[in-house]
Amino acid sequence: MKKILLIEDDSNYIWHIKNFLQRKGYHVLVAFTVSQGKELIEKEQILIIGSDLKLSDGSGMELLEYLREKTYKIPFLFFTCYDKKYYEKEALEKGAKICMNKLQFDLVKETLLEYAYKESNGEGATFHKILLVKKNSEITSIIQTELLKKGIYMIMVETIWEAEDKLLEYQDIELILCDLFLQDGIAMDFFHSMKKLAGIYQNTKEPIFRELPFFISLIIKIYL
Protein backbone atom coordinates (compact mmCIF):
# COMPACT_ATOMS: atom_id res chain seq x y z
CA MET A 1 0.00 0.00 0.00
CA LYS A 2 1.31 3.45 -0.91
CA LYS A 3 2.10 5.77 1.98
CA ILE A 4 1.97 9.49 2.70
CA LEU A 5 5.41 10.98 3.36
CA LEU A 6 5.63 14.00 5.67
CA ILE A 7 8.95 15.87 5.90
CA GLU A 8 9.17 18.33 8.78
CA ASP A 9 11.67 18.94 11.60
CA ASP A 10 9.03 20.02 14.15
CA SER A 11 8.13 16.67 15.74
CA ASN A 12 5.09 18.01 17.62
CA TYR A 13 3.57 19.61 14.50
CA ILE A 14 4.11 16.56 12.34
CA TRP A 15 2.78 14.18 15.01
CA HIS A 16 -0.62 15.88 14.94
CA ILE A 17 -0.84 15.71 11.13
CA LYS A 18 0.31 12.09 11.12
CA ASN A 19 -2.26 11.17 13.77
CA PHE A 20 -5.05 12.89 11.79
CA LEU A 21 -4.20 11.11 8.53
CA GLN A 22 -3.80 7.72 10.22
CA ARG A 23 -7.26 8.06 11.76
CA LYS A 24 -8.55 8.49 8.20
CA GLY A 25 -7.03 5.15 7.22
CA TYR A 26 -3.74 6.20 5.59
CA HIS A 27 -0.27 4.84 6.30
CA VAL A 28 2.08 7.72 7.10
CA LEU A 29 5.88 7.95 7.07
CA VAL A 30 7.82 10.79 8.71
CA ALA A 31 11.23 12.23 7.84
CA PHE A 32 12.94 15.08 9.68
CA THR A 33 15.65 15.90 7.12
CA VAL A 34 16.18 16.09 3.36
CA SER A 35 18.45 13.02 3.45
CA GLN A 36 15.87 10.96 5.37
CA GLY A 37 13.22 12.05 2.88
CA LYS A 38 15.30 10.92 -0.10
CA GLU A 39 15.98 7.58 1.58
CA LEU A 40 12.26 6.91 2.14
CA ILE A 41 11.37 8.01 -1.40
CA GLU A 42 13.78 5.39 -2.76
CA LYS A 43 12.75 2.65 -0.35
CA GLU A 44 8.96 3.04 -0.05
CA GLN A 45 5.97 3.42 -2.36
CA ILE A 46 4.88 7.01 -1.81
CA LEU A 47 1.36 8.30 -2.46
CA ILE A 48 1.94 12.03 -1.82
CA ILE A 49 4.60 14.17 -0.12
CA GLY A 50 4.01 17.06 2.26
CA SER A 51 7.12 19.04 3.19
CA ASP A 52 8.29 22.12 5.03
CA LEU A 53 10.45 24.51 3.02
CA LYS A 54 13.30 24.91 5.51
CA LEU A 55 14.82 21.74 6.98
CA SER A 56 17.88 21.20 9.17
CA ASP A 57 20.08 19.85 6.36
CA GLY A 58 18.69 21.69 3.38
CA SER A 59 15.47 22.80 1.69
CA GLY A 60 12.23 21.19 0.66
CA MET A 61 12.94 22.71 -2.75
CA GLU A 62 15.92 20.37 -2.98
CA LEU A 63 13.58 17.41 -2.46
CA LEU A 64 11.24 18.70 -5.15
CA GLU A 65 14.14 18.99 -7.61
CA TYR A 66 15.27 15.48 -6.66
CA LEU A 67 11.83 14.09 -7.54
CA ARG A 68 11.87 15.73 -10.97
CA GLU A 69 15.41 14.55 -11.70
CA LYS A 70 14.33 11.00 -10.89
CA THR A 71 11.11 11.53 -12.92
CA TYR A 72 8.98 10.40 -9.98
CA LYS A 73 5.41 11.60 -10.48
CA ILE A 74 4.52 12.02 -6.81
CA PRO A 75 2.29 14.99 -5.84
CA PHE A 76 4.37 17.40 -3.72
CA LEU A 77 2.77 19.89 -1.32
CA PHE A 78 4.57 22.60 0.68
CA PHE A 79 3.55 23.84 4.13
CA THR A 80 5.74 26.54 5.67
CA CYS A 81 5.72 29.80 7.63
CA TYR A 82 7.56 31.61 4.84
CA ASP A 83 5.65 34.24 2.87
CA LYS A 84 4.52 32.75 -0.44
CA LYS A 85 5.96 35.66 -2.41
CA TYR A 86 9.47 34.40 -1.61
CA TYR A 87 9.10 30.85 -2.92
CA GLU A 88 5.68 29.98 -4.40
CA LYS A 89 6.44 30.93 -8.03
CA GLU A 90 9.62 28.82 -8.07
CA ALA A 91 7.91 25.90 -6.29
CA LEU A 92 4.99 25.75 -8.73
CA GLU A 93 7.32 26.03 -11.73
CA LYS A 94 9.27 23.05 -10.40
CA GLY A 95 6.12 20.98 -10.04
CA ALA A 96 4.70 21.54 -6.56
CA LYS A 97 0.92 21.16 -6.43
CA ILE A 98 0.19 23.76 -3.77
CA CYS A 99 1.92 25.98 -1.19
CA MET A 100 0.24 26.42 2.19
CA ASN A 101 0.67 28.51 5.31
CA LYS A 102 1.91 26.14 8.01
CA LEU A 103 0.03 28.10 10.68
CA GLN A 104 -3.31 27.29 9.04
CA PHE A 105 -3.17 23.84 10.58
CA ASP A 106 -6.68 22.66 9.67
CA LEU A 107 -6.20 23.74 6.06
CA VAL A 108 -2.87 21.90 5.85
CA LYS A 109 -4.14 18.58 7.17
CA GLU A 110 -7.38 18.69 5.18
CA THR A 111 -5.58 19.57 1.94
CA LEU A 112 -3.18 16.67 2.47
CA LEU A 113 -6.20 14.43 3.04
CA GLU A 114 -7.88 15.64 -0.15
CA TYR A 115 -4.79 15.03 -2.30
CA ALA A 116 -4.26 11.61 -0.72
CA TYR A 117 -7.85 10.63 -1.48
CA LYS A 118 -7.66 11.79 -5.10
CA GLU A 119 -4.32 10.10 -5.68
CA SER A 120 -5.40 6.77 -4.16
CA ASN A 121 -8.69 6.70 -6.08
CA GLY A 122 -7.32 7.51 -9.51
CA GLU A 123 -7.31 10.52 -11.79
CA GLY A 124 -10.59 12.38 -11.85
CA ALA A 125 -11.75 11.17 -8.43
CA THR A 126 -14.13 13.68 -6.90
CA PHE A 127 -13.76 14.94 -3.35
CA HIS A 128 -16.77 16.79 -1.97
CA LYS A 129 -16.83 18.93 1.17
CA ILE A 130 -19.80 19.51 3.44
CA LEU A 131 -19.98 21.55 6.64
CA LEU A 132 -21.53 20.02 9.78
CA VAL A 133 -22.41 22.50 12.54
CA LYS A 134 -23.10 20.33 15.56
CA LYS A 135 -21.71 19.50 19.00
CA ASN A 136 -18.92 17.02 18.41
CA SER A 137 -19.42 13.44 19.51
CA GLU A 138 -18.13 9.96 18.85
CA ILE A 139 -20.90 9.29 16.32
CA THR A 140 -20.03 12.39 14.24
CA SER A 141 -16.41 11.22 14.03
CA ILE A 142 -17.59 7.79 12.86
CA ILE A 143 -19.86 9.40 10.25
CA GLN A 144 -16.96 11.57 9.06
CA THR A 145 -14.74 8.52 8.56
CA GLU A 146 -17.43 6.57 6.68
CA LEU A 147 -18.30 9.48 4.39
CA LEU A 148 -14.64 9.91 3.54
CA LYS A 149 -14.65 6.42 2.01
CA LYS A 150 -17.25 7.74 -0.43
CA GLY A 151 -15.26 10.84 -1.32
CA ILE A 152 -17.14 13.20 1.00
CA TYR A 153 -15.17 15.12 3.61
CA MET A 154 -17.26 16.49 6.47
CA ILE A 155 -15.77 19.57 8.11
CA MET A 156 -17.05 19.69 11.69
CA VAL A 157 -17.53 22.80 13.85
CA GLU A 158 -19.64 23.50 16.93
CA THR A 159 -20.52 27.21 16.70
CA ILE A 160 -21.91 29.72 14.21
CA TRP A 161 -18.72 31.78 14.49
CA GLU A 162 -16.57 28.79 13.54
CA ALA A 163 -18.94 27.90 10.69
CA GLU A 164 -18.75 31.37 9.15
CA ASP A 165 -14.97 31.26 9.43
CA LYS A 166 -14.83 27.89 7.61
CA LEU A 167 -17.10 29.13 4.82
CA LEU A 168 -14.71 32.00 4.18
CA GLU A 169 -11.69 29.70 4.35
CA TYR A 170 -13.05 26.94 2.09
CA GLN A 171 -14.61 28.13 -1.15
CA ASP A 172 -15.49 24.57 -2.22
CA ILE A 173 -17.93 23.59 0.55
CA GLU A 174 -21.09 22.39 -1.20
CA LEU A 175 -23.65 21.85 1.54
CA ILE A 176 -24.38 22.77 5.19
CA LEU A 177 -25.90 20.46 7.82
CA CYS A 178 -26.80 22.27 11.04
CA ASP A 179 -28.28 21.40 14.43
CA LEU A 180 -31.21 23.59 15.45
CA PHE A 181 -29.65 24.62 18.77
CA LEU A 182 -26.00 25.71 18.91
CA GLN A 183 -23.69 27.11 21.57
CA ASP A 184 -23.88 30.68 20.27
CA GLY A 185 -27.36 30.80 18.79
CA ILE A 186 -29.82 28.81 16.71
CA ALA A 187 -29.60 27.52 13.16
CA MET A 188 -31.85 30.25 11.78
CA ASP A 189 -29.41 32.90 13.07
CA PHE A 190 -26.69 31.25 11.02
CA PHE A 191 -28.96 30.81 7.99
CA HIS A 192 -29.91 34.51 7.90
CA SER A 193 -26.32 35.59 8.50
CA MET A 194 -25.19 33.42 5.59
CA LYS A 195 -27.87 34.85 3.27
CA LYS A 196 -26.87 38.38 4.24
CA LEU A 197 -23.18 37.78 3.51
CA ALA A 198 -23.98 36.01 0.24
CA GLY A 199 -26.04 39.03 -0.81
CA ILE A 200 -23.17 41.39 -0.09
CA TYR A 201 -20.78 39.45 -2.33
CA GLN A 202 -23.16 38.28 -5.08
CA ASN A 203 -22.27 41.06 -7.52
CA THR A 204 -18.51 40.78 -7.10
CA LYS A 205 -16.43 39.21 -9.86
CA GLU A 206 -15.11 36.41 -7.64
CA PRO A 207 -17.40 36.19 -4.59
CA ILE A 208 -15.67 34.89 -1.46
CA PHE A 209 -19.01 33.92 0.07
CA ARG A 210 -22.02 32.31 -1.60
CA GLU A 211 -25.36 30.89 -0.53
CA LEU A 212 -25.38 27.10 -0.12
CA PRO A 213 -28.00 24.37 0.39
CA PHE A 214 -28.82 24.48 4.12
CA PHE A 215 -30.41 21.67 6.15
CA ILE A 216 -31.51 21.96 9.79
CA SER A 217 -32.20 19.07 12.14
CA LEU A 218 -32.25 18.21 15.83
CA ILE A 219 -30.74 14.83 14.99
CA ILE A 220 -28.84 14.22 11.77
CA LYS A 221 -29.15 10.69 10.44
CA ILE A 222 -27.02 9.59 7.53
CA TYR A 223 -27.53 6.10 6.15
CA LEU A 224 -24.53 4.62 4.37
Model-derived segments and spans:
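Non-catalytic signal-transmission and effector/linker regions of two-component phosphorelay proteins
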Residues: M1-L5, F105-K129, K134-Q144, W161, ...
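Conserved sequence signature across two-component system core domains
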Residues: I7-E8, A31, I49, V133-K134, ...
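Two-component/phosphorelay signaling modules centered on CheY-like receiver
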Residues: D10-Q36, S137-M156
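Two-component signal transduction core modules
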Residues: I49, F76, C99-M100, I176
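Helix N-cap/capping motif at the beta->alpha junctions
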Residues: V30-E39, G60, M156-D165, A187
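Short amphipathic alpha-helix used as the core "switch/output" element in two-component signaling
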Residues: E39, M61-K73, M188-F209
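Active-site beta3 strand of CheY-like receiver
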Residues: E44-G50, L55, Q171-L177, L182
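Alpha4 helix (beta4-alpha4-beta5 surface) of REC/receiver domains from two-component response regulators
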Residues: E62, D83-M100, D106, M188-D189, ...
